[in-house]
């Protein structure tokens, strides 16, 4: 793998935004559309490589903290590399998208106008 997991998460989000500028989406739904409608990685061997590169214990800790805070309990099977990695990507994607002030402050509860996708992309590329 040439890109780090975090770089690939960023690239996934930015590519999605570029490819879907004409889509009517609420800002608050964008994270779900990008990171929860398809799997980031499907093969267990690839999932293991990503987790080793990121740090398995760091991934477990991040997922546990996120799920306990947001759901009150841990529901992801932390022994399954596929489930662990895809939940980690979901969390990293949320953290990354939160770097866009336009997305989180202006269009969170509104449809994102087509011309604002470029602004969001520019903000995210600076991260």
Q: What kind of region is each of these model predictions?
A:
Residues 22-121:
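Acidic, low-complexity, intrinsically disordered interaction modules
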Residues 124-127:
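Short acidic DE-rich linear segments
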Residues 1-26:
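Short, extreme N-terminal segment that most often corresponds to the first beta-strand
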């Amino acid at each position: 793998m040439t890109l780090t997991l975090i770089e690939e998460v960023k690239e996934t989000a930015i590519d999605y935004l570029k490819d879907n500028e004409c889509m009517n989406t609420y800002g608050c739904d964008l994270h779900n559309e990008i990171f929860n409608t398809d799997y980031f990685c499907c093969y267990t061997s690839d999932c293991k490589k990503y987790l080793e590169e990121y740090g398995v214990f760091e991934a477990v800790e991040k997922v546990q903290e996120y799920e306990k805070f947001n759901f009150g309990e841990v529901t992801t099977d932390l022994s399954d590399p596929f489930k662990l990695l895809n939940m980690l990507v979901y969390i990293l994607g949320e953290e990354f998208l939160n770097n866009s002030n336009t997305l989180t402050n202006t269009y969170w509860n509104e449809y994102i106008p087509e011309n604002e996708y470029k602004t969001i992309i520019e903000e995210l590329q600076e991260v």
